[in-house]
């Protein structure tokens, strides 16, 4: 009887060990697949906002980490991607966060050329209200395309606000908080780049850990 109990316990232990190993293997495989999909989506986004003819490097491979909660809207460091042509930096795409969206944080990426002009903006993640605040998503509206070609004349540039606040950017019908937060995030990012352009564009890549 005792021998049977020990045998059954051993079998159960072995079964549990095998199940744990299988779950770990599946989780690792799933994580890698998700990571690959995220990287592919990021590369597609980068090529949308920084034209291929502007650079000859692999954008995702020249990644730097930037940490400034006041500008980026989040305590943790966020990646930025340097575009270069013939070894010379020509543009940057900076991830940033609008912490004051209607339904929480809005994560976006802002591409800026060496002259300080916006090349493009895209929304990476948000929880804004469908049919109202989700117009920040290019799949829902062309609103984000309005940032292309824009620049900033100092941090007090009053054009960088929604029209309801005296600025030049459209708000959404029934949803002002979302575009107001979004415009503010792009403005802060652009002002930060203008103030730190040489340091940012000439910083060596340091995102290796992120892409292991």
From Swiss-Prot:
BP GO terms, sorted: electron transport chain
Names of the cofactor(s): FMN
Keywords in alphabetical order: Cell inner membrane, Cell membrane, Electron transport, Flavoprotein, FMN, Membrane, Phosphoprotein, Translocase, Transmembrane, Transmembrane helix, Transport
Localization, UniProt: Cell inner membrane
TM region positions: 9-29
Gene Ontology cellular component annotations, sorted alphabetically: plasma membrane
FMN phosphoryl threonine sites (modified residues): 176
Top-level EC class: translocase
Keyword Translocase: yes
Membrane topology note: Single-pass membrane protein
Pfam families: FMN_bind
EC code: 7.-.-.-
Family indicated by similarity: Belongs to the RnfG family.
PANTHER family membership: ION-TRANSLOCATING OXIDOREDUCTASE COMPLEX SUBUNIT G
Function according to Swiss-Prot or TrEMBL: Part of a membrane-bound complex that couples electron transfer with translocation of ions across the membrane.
Name this protein carries in UniProt: Ion-translocating oxidoreductase complex subunit G
